[in-house]
Amino acid sequence: MGSINRAGIAGDLKTMRIHIAVLLTMFLAPLSAIADPEFFDEGPMAGKGYPFSESVRVGNILFISGQVGVDENNELVEGGITGETRQIISNIGGALARRGLGFSDVVKCTVFLADVAEWGEFNTIYTSYFEPPYPARSALGANGLALGARLEVECVAAYPSD
């Protein structure tokens, strides 16, 4: 077995500390430059008295509130998981378009399913709108979704760098 070179370890630790300091500066500096949030209340659920905004922009990030399969009359669409999924993705597309973005700008989605067994049906429709590279995504079972919906989807999108 070889011996431990303590001078080499000390040098590696010093280099590692410098790298950590540089990384912290890179990640923490932008936090101080974050813009004030902009709140947008548009889309099919706007003006209905719900206690949330359709979307919120902070800097170059757009947060889209959870969407359920409601149409412009605030009615849950028919067709179960298939009809609701298509309506939700249409609603998300509208929220993105109103802010000058598209599906390719989405970086994260969270999917809440009343019945996880319907994940496959949802996924088939989802992949017809989102293309590789796909956004990061979580999917989980949820009991008691708003308006008796089969699913709810929220997304985060990023504005392209200038």
What residue spans do the PLM features occupy?
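N-terminal presequence-like segments and the immediate start of the first folded domain
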Residues: 20-27, 31-90, 94-108, 113-162
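Residue-identity detector for glycine
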Residues: 2, 8-11
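Proteins with a high burden of low-complexity, intrinsically disordered sequence enriched in S/T/G/P/A and R
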Residues: 5-6, 99
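Positively charged n-region of N-terminal signal peptides that target proteins for export
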Residues: 14-19
